[in-house]
Amino acid sequence: MSKYSDAKELAGLTLGKKTDYANQYDPSLLQPVPRSLNRDDLQLGDELPFMGHDIWTLYELSWLNNKGLPQVAVGEVYIPATSANLIESKSFKLYLNSYNQTRFDSWEEVRQRLITDLSHCAGEAVEVAVNSVTHYTQQPIVTMEGECIDEQDIDISSYDFDDRLLEGAAGEEWVTETLHSHLLKSNCLITNQPDWGSVEIRYQGHKIDREKLLRYLVSFREHNEFHEQCVERIFTDLMKYCQPESLTVFARYTRRGGLDINPYRSTEQAKPDHNHRMARQ
């Protein structure tokens, strides 16, 4: 379990508890989780070593127009990594469900409500796009960039998280390369439900030993943290043990409750070049 799984800030969350589903707009359903919980554990101060966003895709976004006709859309939300809070995913789902039987005058009104409520919960301005389903019909299904490290013939017997698996991972050769793995799996901090993801690591620095990197990523398999926290842990551990000159860690998780979360942390830029979904999303 995470060191902070019993933190008082988590006690009031609806996650892991039986809840009623509201169908009338209710922004009070949103629940924040302080980013400081895991950042204190990672010894991160106010000056973060990365830029980034948490990119959410909202696949189950629906409301009524002013004549009562249901509308459906796909939303994209960009929450800055500098915000005080991340948004707890079950509360996000319940909040979106509250739109289902509520009338709005326009799509723009829905977008503005989302911006206002999510920004208030996160503690910083968020960006929101509300797109029609047809917007996505010509978009590609992509994979991660770079080389996949998953096909290594190695024995693994322990699945307990261990950052020391990265000890000695930095070699002599100086490279610029991108690696990825589809074997990232962790567990929800509260419910212990599995979270499945793929992770892309782009860096410039001493060449990272791929076997050590894969063993490290697999060690998340029984680890309990939220998606965003896992990505920040990967970033800080790579910085600690490998000390690259530049580093980007981008994970794309499978959806749950109509939402997927795609945390992006980088020394180079605050957002990825695209937000195309992958085959498992």
Swiss-Prot record:
Catalytic reactions on record: 7-aminomethyl-7-carbaguanine + 2 NADP(+) = 7-cyano-7-deazaguanine + 2 NADPH + 3 H(+)
EC number: 1.7.1.13
Gene3D superfamilies reported for this sequence: 3.30.1130.10
Protein's pathway: tRNA modification; tRNA-queuosine biosynthesis
Pfam families: QueF, QueF_N
Region (Disordered): 261-281
Residues holding substrate: I87, E88, S89, H227, E228
Origin: domain of life: Bacteria
GO molecular function, one term: preQ1 synthase activity
InterPro entries assigned: GTP-CH-I_C/QueF, NADPH_dep_7-cyano-7-deazaG_red, QueF, QueF_N, QueF_type2
Keyword annotations of the record: Cytoplasm, NADP, Oxidoreductase, Queuosine biosynthesis
BP term (GO), one: queuosine biosynthetic process
Feature: compositional bias, Basic and acidic residues: 268-281
Residue sites binding NADPH per the record: S89, K90, R256, G257
One Gene Ontology term, aspect cellular component: cytoplasm
Subcellular location: Cytoplasm
Active site per the UniProt annotation: C188, D195
Principal subcellular localization: cytoplasm
Paired cysteines (S-S): none
Subunit structure: Homodimer.
Sequence similarity: Belongs to the GTP cyclohydrolase I family. QueF type 2 subfamily.
Function: Catalyzes the NADPH-dependent reduction of 7-cyano-7-deazaguanine (preQ0) to 7-aminomethyl-7-deazaguanine (preQ1).
NCBIfam families attached to this UniProt entry: QueF
Protein name per the record: NADPH-dependent 7-cyano-7-deazaguanine reductase
Native source organism of the sequence: Vibrio vulnificus (strain YJ016)
Name of the gene this protein is made from: queF
